Amino acid sequence: MEKLVDDGLANAIGLSSFNITQIQRILSEARIPPANLQIELHAYFQQQQLINFCNKHNISITCFSPLGSPDIGQFFSMFGESVVVPKILENPVVRDIATKHNKTSAQVLLRFSLQKGLAVIPKSLTPTRIRENINVFDFTLDECDMKNLNGLDKSPAGRLFDLFVSKGAKKHPEYPF
């Protein structure tokens, strides 16, 4: 990747689903430090320690599944898998804040991450939801809203994509990814 940057074929190097130990190893061995880390991050899995580490090392963060992947259960059902996914969008705290601001739960969750200085990449297929996801810059969550949303963190127990990782992968020396 460093050669791609040197050759002008890439502007920066990014990482995906790395933990602190893995990033430390990259920082100690790489000539060009990573510019961005893409990780699962949402109200139930906030990863504050990893955010603090990245901030200290000038690594921006992009949140995948900022809405908690509400439709992922349907995806797995196509393969005969039954996966119960927590419905962050239906959480009463999130809904109350959405009502207070006359916004949707999705808009509140996106705004929550944005106010923390994080980039978000929600997956949406419908034009209505795509427009809804863009309309998050006309309101601000107050200190009480942020505190209540911060209180939803379940730490590692809130990780959704752990539900979908094969049992064999969990034995890998680099796990969790």
Model-found features: residue ranges?
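Beta/alpha (TIM)-barrel catalytic core signal, keyed to glycine-rich beta->alpha loops juxtaposed to Asp/Glu
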Residues: 1-177
